[in-house]
UniProtKB/Swiss-Prot annotation:
It is found in: Chromosome. Residues 1-31, 1038-1153 are annotated as: Disordered. The gene is capg-1. This is Condensin complex subunit capg-1. Disruption phenotype: RNAi-mediated knockdown disrupts X-chromosome localization of dpy-27, mix-1, dpy-26 and sdc-3. Results in chromosome segregation defects in mitosis leading to aneuploidy. In a sex-1 mutant background, leads to high embryonic lethality. Pfam families: Cnd3. It comes from Caenorhabditis elegans. Residues 1038-1047 have a biased composition (Basic and acidic residues).
Amino acid sequence: MPPKKRIRGPKLPALREEKSTGTDVASDESFNESADFLNNEELNNDQNDAENTVLSEGVSTLRINENMTKEDRACISAALFIKKRVVESIRTVFQSRDDINDEIHTSSRKLIAAFKKADQNRKKKVDLMKVFLDEIDVRLSMIIEEVTVPEHRARVFKLIAVTITEIQAFKLPSDLLDFIINFINTWGHSDNVAARINTTCFISYIFETGKRYLTTEGEYSGFEVKIAAKMFLQLKRALLDKEQTARVPAIRGLGFLQEIPIPSNWPVDAMKHSPRELLLRSCRDTAWECRLVAVQSMVPLETDVRLLSDIVYYDKCLNVRVAALEQFSNLRPNKHVREKIEMLDLCLKDHEVNIRDAAKEVLKNWVRNLSTRWSESQKSKDSNDVVILNSNSESTTGEENKMKGYILAAQALTLLWLTGALETLEGHSNLRRLITHTLDVIRQMYVCQADPINTFAEVLISDLREKMKSSAVPIITKSTVGSILDDSELADTQDPSTNRAMIFFWRCLVDYISDRKRNDADKINAMSRFVSPLRTMVEHVEKILVRVKNLDVYPNISQRADYEDHTFVLQMSIVENIICVMRHAPTDQPGVDAYKQMLISMLMNVFYQKKVIDLIVQELAQFYKEDPNALFTLFNDRIEEMRSKYKSGQFPVIENSVPVGETKVRKDLEEETRKTGRRTISDKDGIAVIDLYELKVLNALLKTGILLGWSTTYQNRYNNKLREGISSKDLSTRVLCTECIGIGAIYDYDQAENTLREMMKSFNTQDEPVQCSLIAALTDIQIEHGDQVDALFSWNSKQPNFAVFLSDIVVNAHVSGECETMLRAVEAISRLFLNTKIDPNQQKWQRTMVTLMTRASYAITNRFSAKVRSTIIVMLKFFCSINKNNQLLLIKSFHNFFDMWANSTTPERLTENRHEMVTKLKRCAATFVALTRHSTLPLEEQKKCKPTHVDLVDDIFHEMAGAPDSTSVDYYICALNFVEYQSLSRSALTKIHGDLESYIFLHELDGDKHRYNELRKAHRKIAKILGLNEDEIEEVPSKTDLRKEAAPSKTNKRNANLISTDIAVDNDVNMEEDDKPGPSRPATVRKPRAPRATPASATKKKPLVEEDALEILKSPPRNTKKPPSRPTTATRPTAVAARTAPPRSARKLRSEK
């Protein structure tokens, strides 16, 4: 029944006591369906309760006397039975503590018995169905108006929902369902927040039980379409509630309905949005509680990867981000591989520990699921009847986990990730990092994370059983190295991509063992299980190279249209990873000699990629550290031998080299030949391949740093080639020549100065890779030779030196674009700051510092801008912790930084909302002041230098006195509150305290109290440190604060839009949302309590701790408040109970007065 105003009259007279004649009632067969009515003693005992029972008007006039008919007695007995069953059922469930599900099931049986009794007596003098529904109405109305002990109230709702479901299953009348629908519809429009919360929870339970137990065709969640549509529309209406606590149960209810198909005869109002669509839109709700429940309730699909990734990246609530990341565990890792790799890579590098832990949990679930599926596929038919006890419980000793095949699941993920990752150096580097985290997770799953790495290797070997080798891709171990790419049954059934994945995972596993070793003995013992001695490894690798060469005619991939390019990528990857494994092989003198000769023969292959050549040269350079000229001479002689032996397109074989990758190079030459109209490859084209190979090796040799000087021999041999290569049509040639000239200039700057000046004049017309190479080269030269590089800019008056040149690149770069040149310029400035002696008084360094500070304050719009900001902040943090002069450079740049933003014509670079300019710059001030704290310096610097914040305060006072009308002062003055006053001497604090008093008096009568408030905050902080008894003066609200207070409150609106706001792209710009729920309506305010006395602990002196402002620019302020926990039901949030009327017990007491 709907809530209504009950008119209470005088107290009813008590029923007269008369002799009971209950034998007639017990003999009536029409009311003997329940066993409770077969006991005459129970009927006699219940007659005493009849006196205190308030029934309907018809029943209350019936009295038990000798002249009463059997029908009248049965009516009263049935009414007592109904009341007793309803009260007992609801009371038992509400007060239950153990076996809650059993209690709900038993109580539902009692309610069904009472319902049947009322249904049988609906045609008697008194409609007992109305009595049954009134009792339900009274009990539910007492529960629905408040939300205290929510888990107990939820049990009652579950009880009614289960009862309705069973009544529907037994094909009984729908009186109870109709009554509940009317009850829900009425209370759903109540002004009471608790009533709306409980109503929505009630609907969710009804849908949940109907979906679970009723599967009738032509119905929706077990109910008729018309009835289900009413409840669905009620949930949809609840999504528009202004209270987030009332929207949460509605969102959870939609989670139960998201997988149920919408019927064709669904009403028009309900067909506008499906439950899943409404649930996904709730992921954008303004309240973090609603977003959290929406993410947790959704059943993720592969099409939701983009939505979940955006939530993980950009949501402002940490709990919501973690919940979205956990949903990836429910997705298969074999779809949208690249997006999932990027997401996990970023999460594993996130500064929040919870995000990193959740990402590792995703990896753990993927590994466990793969190993479980593999184990199930390996079970024989004879083992189906075996019952495994406690299969869900994890072993504490780890014995059961050592035969699970987790390591094979990790290799399967590696094969999957390699197919989706980018074939670039950065892509493979990120993938190796991801596999390293996966191995950490597997080590925990094997329960040996605290043991030496040798124990982990032993566990892996014991897990690789023979039946695993025959049915899955095997792990490469010491005993299987020689079978890589061999002509075996395994090689015939797998393509080269699988073999590449095996080798890649082998390399990652070996690197992991080397990094996680406790000592050399631990590493040697663990490595001996996966790598053979160096001499044996050389023999294996020589055979493997021949097999890699034969991949050019592999039958499984030769049918691809681009099989040459695909095979070339696989070949280079295999060779690269094998060389990386060779680094960890146990060495002996014969093995070292064989390894050196193998590297020389590999270096003579002109078809390798640049990354493979770099790797070979790095390994080979270790043998020529004492005599680098011998290596250069050997290389030059072999190049001349190649040129002399090259004939008619046939490349010579030098030092028994294996021409891996020749097919790809020949294909490119043939295509170039067809474009020019020639039939055969000319000698000029072949010589061009050798020349490019010479540049690659020369570049790799110079980067090793083993060369002692750029002698005349090298000048005569390479200078002309390098100058000609700068103007080449091939981009790779120009990049290689630029890098070589830059490295050569480090040894002899004079011989390369003119070439570098010509390149700088045409800098703007060069391609981006050439610009990046030139910036890196000039940076290395300036670090080595100082300001000599500035002479290259003498022709340009606007950019007189290298520092200004780099600053202009950073400033003029487009904000939204991803400019690689700008990123290299930022990195170059960072290297100059950290590797050169900086004078804080020089104008060029101040300008460069302002450029970095300005770029770091830009709004984050994508991953590229986040990378630029993190690079600058991390560099400045390290730079300012070296010495005092570095801190002075940052402090002297403060004025120009704030002056730039005060006169900026593009404030949207800082923030999209102009009204947040002061807030954003205040956060920037907090960050940059925190970087210059005196406590960040080494102890020796702290003792011999005074704090640089003294100079900062002097600069602020000078600016206030010199240009009081400047807008930059409003920003500059924000830095006062973040100064580390604790490190200042008492005399300095006393002087600052006195100066502040004069400025406070000067600005006391200002119209806008912003400056006055900022000065007062700093004044009180210093007074507290000095121990002065200063009267606490309240801050005067500024004009901005007054405008905020005058703005209309959002709580005046009745409904909130379902489509609220998009997830913020810039986390650092948007301020944290208000997570405090407001009242649903103006309620009576009780008198506040008297203020409590100050506890003794509060009177103790506490150390002054300032918030670390370095975290401000990294991420937005996080809400550390945890979401509401529900240990029992986990279904409803806690809401502020706002009653609209006294409780029924109070009304009853007033009516009896």
